[in-house]
Amino acid sequence: MSEKHPGPLVVEGKLTDAERMKLESNYLRGTIAEDLNDGLTGGFKGDNFLLIRFHGMYQQDDRDIRAERAEQKLEPRHAMLLRCRLPGGVITTKQWQAIDKFAGENTIYGSIRLTNRQTFQFHGILKKNVKPVHQMLHSVGLDALATANDMNRNVLCTSNPYESQLHAEAYEWAKKISEHLLPRTRAYAEIWLDQEKVATTDEEPILGQTYLPRKFKTTVVIPPQNDIDLHANDMNFVAIAENGKLVGFNLLVGGGLSIEHGNKKTYARTASEFGYLPLEHTLAVAEAVVTTQRDWGNRTDRKNAKTKYTLERVGVETFKAEVERRAGIKFEPIRPYEFTGRGDRIGWVKGIDDNWHLTLFIENGRILDYPGRPLKTGLLEIAKIHKGDFRITANQNLIIAGVPESEKAKIEKIAKESGLMNAVTPQRENSMACVSFPTCPLAMAEAERFLPSFIDKIDNLMAKHGVSDEHIVMRVTGCPNGCGRAMLAEVGLVGKAPGRYNLHLGGNRIGTRIPRMYKENITEPEILASLDELIGRWAKEREAGEGFGDFTVRAGIIRPVLDPARDLWD
């Protein structure tokens, strides 16, 4: 498909069963309320298994003990993952104390998991604790509405929003966009918060009765940082400033990383530039992009339903013109912007208001008390005394934001004593994994549990070749759905089977190029052997300041992906 040969605006054919399920759900109610009272199973049945996703939950089970339980003729140990809605990752210390308590007392694993979509997840919530978790969140001004399934998910925003006036304004827009695109159904309030059914007809003016064809992800990004990885997202607002003040956004549409092994109709894709818009049109444009995808997205094949596929089918210019028509504007030409990096600046950074921000590296975002490193207790102690707020970053780290000079030493002392400020290598700081085993039902290979020891070995290779002070953006994702964003890394590992990964090379440091598969279905020793040779070559042959990904392309080791819809699989 190309601009010259656009496909149909709407794909005709038999709708997927998910479309039937949404239509029959009575605006996402289903029979969830009744299912909650069924004590015969630890899970949700039938359509409710999928409907709870619209309420921010996934039903999972512990895969480490799945076979053992099957032998004992027991059902899997069902438990829910809950993902909070937290635009821009900002959470108050009061909210943090509440989630710390819930995680410790009411989840199987006792941990808080920071995600690369700037929010937190609880893993291992038993069915009896599902309603209490929603009520706990509500009591501190939070919710889990629309953080999963066919909605606009948690809206990301470049971290450190108080570092300048620009950051503060961008964060406010992230919140506004999130609120504007929320579903209007009262199902969430009725089921979880016991609010009375009101005798009015539900309406979904933006999302429609069957919601979106597939998940939809939005970011607000402040150059030169691309910490939120805009090219992994459907709709991106790139902040444009004049004299330090936000004046508008460049809009980029149609990024996304999920693929299916061996299915050449699926591909990762970077977002396309649509144009510049002044601030006052932001919500109208956001709504227009969402409703165009609502109406034109493929509802006959969920593997081909995301915005990136709609753009390729109808053509970028056609989609853009429809957004202009619906929003009642004409995009101006893209304003200049550039990215220089996407990692977090670990440690103390001083803001323009003379307050300090402390970015803590949290490996894999997993907050738990480890032997000799009581991370969870340490953060709770900081939350009890800190007057500012916490900010979760898209790199799964945590910022203690807005610390006055007078409080700095006290907070640093707790952080150091809790193992929250242990020195790590630049390589570890720039490596990331999704959750994968044991809780993710889609996992094909280990990711979070694999990464720490794998990076030990990579650190040894970096030292061997004299590049320990450098880093390679390295990511591991347990399956091709790609939550670990490996398809925007310089080195991406995509899980294929237990202990086996596809090795992708040729992305870049700033996250604007999709990496190509270099070797398929290989083991950790094979991965390390390949990287040993390639890191050695990079160390010897690179040009000044040349990142590993750019080197692999320039040296002809891997062909760059220039047009992923057509050449990703070549």
UniProtKB/Swiss-Prot annotation:
Class of this enzyme: oxidoreductase
Record field: transmembrane: none
Alphabetized InterPro entries for the sequence: CysI (IPR011786), NiRdtase/SiRdtase_haem-b_fer (IPR005117), Nit/Sulf_reduc_fer-like_dom_sf (IPR036136), NO2/SO3_Rdtase_4Fe4S_dom (IPR006067), NO2/SO3_Rdtase_4Fe4S_prot (IPR045169), NO2/SO3_Rdtase_4Fe4S_sf (IPR045854), NO2/SO3_Rdtase_FeS/sirohaem_BS (IPR006066)
Keyword Phosphoprotein: no
Catalyzed reactions per annotation: hydrogen sulfide + 3 NADP(+) + 3 H2O = sulfite + 3 NADPH + 4 H(+)
Record-listed E.C. numbers: 1.8.1.2
GO biological process terms, semicolon-separated: cysteine biosynthetic process; hydrogen sulfide biosynthetic process; sulfate assimilation
Co-factor: note: Binds 1 siroheme per subunit.
Pathway: Sulfur metabolism; hydrogen sulfide biosynthesis; hydrogen sulfide from sulfite (NADPH route): step 1/1
Key word NADP present: yes
Source taxon at top rank: Bacteria
Similarity comment: Belongs to the nitrite and sulfite reductase 4Fe-4S domain family.
Subunit record text: Alpha(8)-beta(8). The alpha component is a flavoprotein, the beta component is a hemoprotein.
Family annotation (HAMAP family): CysI
Protein name stated in the entry: Sulfite reductase [NADPH] hemoprotein beta-component
Source organism: Escherichia coli (strain SMS-3-5 / SECEC)
